[in-house]
């Protein structure tokens, strides 16, 4: 029997990154981890910066970094809309480490007019990219 699938579109501000049938999607929503499969109840949620993992019809997995965004689940279609989407293999680990270092330095040297929220957002994005890179490294090592 064929696996039950749902159509998934992952779209960034620049282009459509993925479009196809998937068995499952895992993302971090505003209220925690979400696992989306065929038959999931309709849902609209914010997505936190982090990893999106999909399992395709053939059983293969693909991992993406999302800068945050919106998830919409409908009976036959799931849509992920994000400002920035990167395939895990395309993440520059050194650039993410540098962004993390810069955000931490800004926070440590904060003045009276410092925008703490913006620094926390930048730090969260850099940390999320690094978590995606680490996940890929662990999966390759297996």
From Swiss-Prot:
Its main location: membrane. It comes from the Bacteria. It is a peripheral membrane protein. It is found in: Cell inner membrane. Disulfide bonds: none annotated. Gene3D superfamilies: ATP synthase delta/epsilon subunit, C-terminal domain (1.20.5.440), F0F1 ATP synthase delta/epsilon subunit, N-terminal (2.60.15.10). GO terms for cellular component: plasma membrane; proton-transporting ATP synthase complex. The keyword Ion transport applies. One of its GO terms (molecular function) is ATP binding. It holds the Pfam family ATP-synt_DE_N. Keywords: ATP synthesis, Cell inner membrane, Cell membrane, CF(1), Hydrogen ion transport, Ion transport, Membrane, Transport. Produces ATP from ADP in the presence of a proton gradient across the membrane. Belongs to the ATPase epsilon chain family. F-type ATPases have 2 components, CF(1) - the catalytic core - and CF(0) - the membrane proton channel. CF(1) has five subunits: alpha(3), beta(3), gamma(1), delta(1), epsilon(1). CF(0) has three main subunits: a, b and c. This is ATP synthase epsilon chain. The lineage of its organism: Bacteria, Pseudomonadati, Pseudomonadota, Gammaproteobacteria, Alteromonadales.
């Amino acid at each position: 029997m064929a696996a039950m699938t749902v159509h998934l579109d992952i779209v960034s501000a620049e282009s459509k990154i993925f479009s196809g049938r998937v068995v499952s999607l895992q993302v971090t929503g505003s209220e925690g981890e979400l696992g989306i499969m065929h038959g999931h109840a309709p849902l609209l949620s914010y997505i936190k910066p982090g990893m999106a993992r999909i399992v395709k019809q053939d059983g293969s997995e693909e991992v993406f970094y999302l800068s945050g965004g919106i998830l919409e689940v409908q009976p036959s279609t799931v849509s992920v809309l994000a400002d920035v989407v990167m395939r895990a293999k395309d993440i520059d680990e050194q650039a993410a480490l540098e962004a993390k270092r810069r955000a931490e330095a800004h926070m440590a040297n904060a003045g009276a007019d410092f925008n703490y929220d913006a620094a926390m957002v930048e730090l969260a994005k850099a940390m999320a990219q690094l978590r995606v890179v680490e996940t890929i490294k662990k999966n390759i090592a297996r």
